[in-house]
Structure formats: C-alpha cells, structure tokens
C-alpha cells in the first residue's frame, strides 16, 4: 500500500536500501551498478529502484536534502515497507586535518545541531550511532578494496550556509571528521523503529583548507564509495 510520499507496492523494496540525497544519483546507481532494475516509486520525483547486485536483491532511493526530508523517507521505508537496513551514501565536507579529498568517511556516530533526536528522547541527548554489524562490514570491504577510509564522528548540520564561522575549528578540535546534513536523523529514525543504519560518505571538499574535487575526481570517488556500499549490502 502506498504511503503519502512513496507510491511503491508491498514487496517492492529489498530489505537493504542504499540512499543518496539526489534522486538522479539513485537513478545513476541503479542503471550503473544493478541488474534487472525496476523503478518502484516516483512521488515528487523522489525515485526508487530495486534490482540485483551479484544476484542479491538491493534497492536504492533518494532521500532529499536535510534531516526533515530524509526522516520522512526512512521512516516510511522501515515502518511501511519492512526495510531492515538503510545505508546512506553521500558526500561530506571534511574538517579534520588528517581527512583528505577522496577519502571515504564512515559515520560511527553523528553529532548535530538539529533537535529531532531530542524530540524523540524527551529533550535528552541521544547518542546517534551506526549499527556495528553494518559498520564492521563496511570497514572490511573498504580495506579489501584498498579504498582510503576514516571511521568516526560526523556532524549533521541543519544549515548549509551557517552563520557560525568558528564552528568548524571547534569541530576539528573535537575530532569530527566531516559535515553532512542527514546522518544523525537517519540514525535516530532507525533506532526508534528497530532497524539498522549506516552512513558512508565520500569527501568532496575540505571546509577548512578550501580544497575541492574536480567533477572527474568526484565521480571516481563516488564510484569507489558505491562499491564499498554495495559489497556491504550483500554481505550483511
């Protein structure tokens, strides 16, 4: 039965869904990496697809930008479509000095300036963390493929254009690897609904050093990350 935001039918989604922010990126993943692909939803042009990777069923769907958007889609996938594993695949801006362009960052935990997890937890702090079994498998796959990987805390920001110019130096001091806009929300929804979640990010720019990938480097880095994510998806 369709939800307000996903017009797929029961059974259309695999137990594991890879989720980029951009729905066109979801389309690219499906067409590039999966076989026997079927588009299963398109409400608001938030495309979802299901296919196979090395013979195993995998789905991919966009989640939009920011915590409010991704929380809607992740909630409905888990609560209404029986999805058990959500793996966010996206990009981040690095802040720690030892994190470099094209590294893969795996969010073991996700700090945030959003209040969504406090709302869930009676205004208390909630430690938004990845599922360890997904985390362990992703690190294993990255090392097997010789993809440079950093594992640790990320920061999920509500504002892309932040007025807090000094916040990134504070993040670096506290050991935060990089900044995205969704991980903390996804981890909160998954915990609330009893599912597993992981965030895998490619470093597209370094916020403090002012470095950025070229379009060609960005694509290669994304493809490397996707191979890690897909191998994780079929081995959990």
UniProtKB/Swiss-Prot annotation:
The keyword Glycosyltransferase applies. It is an enzyme of class 2 (transferase). The record marks 218 as: Important for catalytic activity. It catalyses: a purine D-ribonucleoside + phosphate = a purine nucleobase + alpha-D-ribose 1-phosphate; a purine 2'-deoxy-D-ribonucleoside + phosphate = a purine nucleobase + 2-deoxy-alpha-D-ribose 1-phosphate. A purine D-ribonucleoside binds at residues 5, 180-182, 204-205. GO terms for biological process: purine nucleoside catabolic process. GO terms for molecular function: purine-nucleoside phosphorylase activity. Its EC number is 2.4.2.1. The active site is at residue 205. Keywords: Glycosyltransferase, Transferase. InterPro entries: DeoD-type, Nucleoside_phosphorylase_d, Nucleoside_phosphorylase_sf. GO terms for cellular component: cytosol. Pfam families: PNP_UDP_1. Signal peptide: none annotated. Catalyzes the reversible phosphorolytic breakdown of the N-glycosidic bond in the beta-(deoxy)ribonucleoside molecules, with the formation of the corresponding free purine bases and pentose-1-phosphate. HAMAP family: Pur_nucleosid_phosp (MF_01627). Homohexamer; trimer of homodimers. NCBIfam families: deoD, PRK05819.1, PRK13374.1. PANTHER family: FI09636P-RELATED (PTHR43691:SF11), URIDINE PHOSPHORYLASE (PTHR43691). Belongs to the PNP/UDP phosphorylase family. This is Purine nucleoside phosphorylase DeoD-type 2. It comes from Vibrio parahaemolyticus serotype O3:K6 (strain RIMD 2210633). The lineage of its organism: Bacteria, Pseudomonadati, Pseudomonadota, Gammaproteobacteria, Vibrionales.
């Amino acid at each position: 039965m369709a939800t307000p935001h996903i017009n797929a039918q029961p059974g259309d989604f695999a137990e594991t869904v890879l989720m980029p922010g951009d729905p066109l990126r979801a389309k690219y993943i499906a067409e590039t990496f999966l076989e026997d692909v079927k588009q299963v939803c398109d409400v608001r042009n938030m495309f979802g697809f299901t296919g196979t990777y090395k013979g195993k069923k995998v789905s991919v769907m966009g989640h939009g930008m920011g915590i409010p958007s991704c929380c809607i889609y992740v909630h409905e996938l888990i609560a209404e479509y029986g999805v058990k594993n959500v793996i966010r695949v996206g990009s981040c801006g690095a802040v720690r000095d030892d994190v470099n362009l094209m590294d893969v960052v795996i969010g073991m935990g996700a700090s945030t300036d959003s209040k969504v997890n406090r709302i869930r937890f009676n205004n208390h702090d909630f430690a938004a963390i990845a599922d360890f079994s997904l985390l362990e498998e992703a690190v294993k796959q990255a090392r097997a493929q010789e993809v440079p990987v950093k594992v640790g805390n990320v920061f999920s920001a509500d504002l892309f254009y932040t007025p807090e110019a000094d916040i990134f130096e504070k993040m670096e001091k506290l050991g935060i690897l990089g900044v995205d806009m969704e991980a903390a929300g996804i981890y909160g929804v998954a915990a609330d609904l009893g599912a597993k979640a992981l965030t895998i990010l490619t470093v597209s720019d370094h916020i403090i050093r002012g470095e950025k990938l070229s379009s060609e480097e960005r694509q290669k880095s994304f493809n490397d990350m996707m191979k890690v994510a897909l191998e994780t998806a079929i081995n959990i």
